[in-house]
Amino acid sequence: MSVFKGEVTSLPPDKSISHRAALIASLSDGETEIMNFSAGFDNQSTLGVLQACGIPVRQEEVPGPWGTAILRVVIKSKGLWSLTPPSAPLQCNNSGSTMRMFSGILAGQPFQSELVGDASLLKRPMRRIADPLIQMGAGVSLSPIGTAPVVITGSKDLHAIDYRLPVASAQVKSLVAFAGLHAEGETRIYEPLSSRNHTELMLGLEPRVENEERVIVVPGRRQREARPFQIPADPSAACFIVSLGLLARGSEIMIRDVCLNPTRAAFLDILIRAGAAVTIENRRTVGGESIGDILVEGTRDMEPLVISDPQEVAIAIDELPMLGVLSAFATERFELMNAGELRTKESDRIEALALNLERLGFVCHQEPGGLSVTGRKGRPSGPVVVECFDDHRIAMSFAVASKACGEDIELSDREVAGVSFPNFFSLLDALEV
C-alpha cells in the first residue's frame, strides 16, 4: 500500500470564488486584477462568456508566493450595463455555475442571449433559475423539460423582489443578487438554510436576521468600483488530498492556504468528529475569507461517517462523493440522508456512488435523498471500470481510493478531472513516496 507525504502549495484556486470574482469584475467600474484565478475548465467557461459579451479579459502566468506559477486575470468594465449582445449562443461547456449565475447578469442587460452547454449540462435542471428572474421582469425560456438551452430576454427595467429560496442554493442566491444589482429598489433574499456565502462577502452585503430567517438585502443600481481579488486554495479540492492522507496509513500531508470559510469547510468538521487526524494551523483572514493550513495524518482509525443534518449537507454538498468513498473504504460503512440535491449535480451522484461502490464489492442501499453502505462482500478479483458519468468529482473520488488503497480501478474518463483540478493526477504522483 502506498504512503503519501509532502507539502501541497499547488492546490487549485477556489473554483467558486474565481467564478464570482470574474462576474463581479464585469459589473464594476474600472480594471479588476484577480490573482491566483482558477485555470480549470469551468472557470475558463466563465471568462469565455464574458469575452463573448464584449468584456475585455487578459490572462497571464506570474510567479506565486510559493515559487509556483499562478494565473493573473485582468478584467475591464464600465459597470453594470457594460455587456454587449453576443453574436452566437454563449457556451458554458460543463459549468452549471457559469450558466446559472451569469443568467442573473444577463437578465439586467437590454438584449436577448442564449446559454448552452455540453451534453451533461444540457440534462441539468434549470427551472429554479427562471422563476425569480421572470418575477423581476426578465424573459426566460427553457426546454420543454426545464433544462438548457436557456434563453434570456434581458431588461434595463428590472424591479426588486422579495424572494425565498426553495432550497439551499448558492448559485440561485447569487443569480438573484446579480439581477438585484440591476433592479430598481432593494431585492431581499430569504435563505431557509445557509449556503456558501462568497457572493455576499465579495459584494459587501451584510446578512440580517428577521423573524429567525437569514435575509440578504441587495441595493439596486449602485455603481461599484473595481477592486482586486486574491483567490485562496479550493477546499473542495483539498478534500481529495485530505482523504488520500487518511486512507493511506503512515501518510502525512500539509496543505497550504486553503479557504476555510465556515460555509465551505464543513467536511473538516465531519472528519474531525469521526476521529480523523486532521488539524487546522495558521488560520487567518485574507480579503474577507478565512484561510489556513490543513495537516492530515494517516495515523489512526476513524468512525464511519454519518451525515444527516440538512444544514451540514447543504454546505458540504460538493465534498459528499469523496466523503462517501472515504468512509466506505476506511470503515465499510457510510450513511447519508437529506441529500436529494446530489441527484441534480453533474451526474446523479447518489446513483453514481452506489453503482461504482457495488462494482467494487460494497453493499449499498439507495433512498431518494440518501445512500447507505453496510459492508463489503470482498474485493473483486480483477480490474473494475468505474463509470465517471462525465463528473469530475466522481472520477477523482474513486481515483483517490485506487491510489491510496491499491484498488485495481480503471476510470472511464480521467480527463474530466480537469474541470476543477487540472493537476490532480500529477499531484497524487508527486506526493507518493
From Swiss-Prot:
Pfam families listed in its UniProt record: EPSP_synthase (PF00275)
Entry keyword annotation includes Oxidoreductase: no
Record bears the keyword Cytoplasm: yes
Active site, renumbered: 318 (proton acceptor)
Keywords: Amino-acid biosynthesis, Aromatic amino acid biosynthesis, Cytoplasm, Transferase
Superkingdom assignment: Bacteria
CDD domains assigned to the protein according to its UniProt record, in alphabetical order: EPSP_synthase (cd01556)
Binding of phosphoenolpyruvate, residues: 15, 96, 124, 171, 349, 393
EC numbers, comma separated: 2.5.1.19
Catalytic activity reported: 3-phosphoshikimate + phosphoenolpyruvate = 5-O-(1-carboxyvinyl)-3-phosphoshikimate + phosphate
GO MF annotation terms: 3-phosphoshikimate 1-carboxyvinyltransferase activity
Subcellular location: Cytoplasm
Enzyme class per UniProt: transferase
Similarity comment: Belongs to the EPSP synthase family.
Name of the featured protein: 3-phosphoshikimate 1-carboxyvinyltransferase
UniProt gene name: aroA
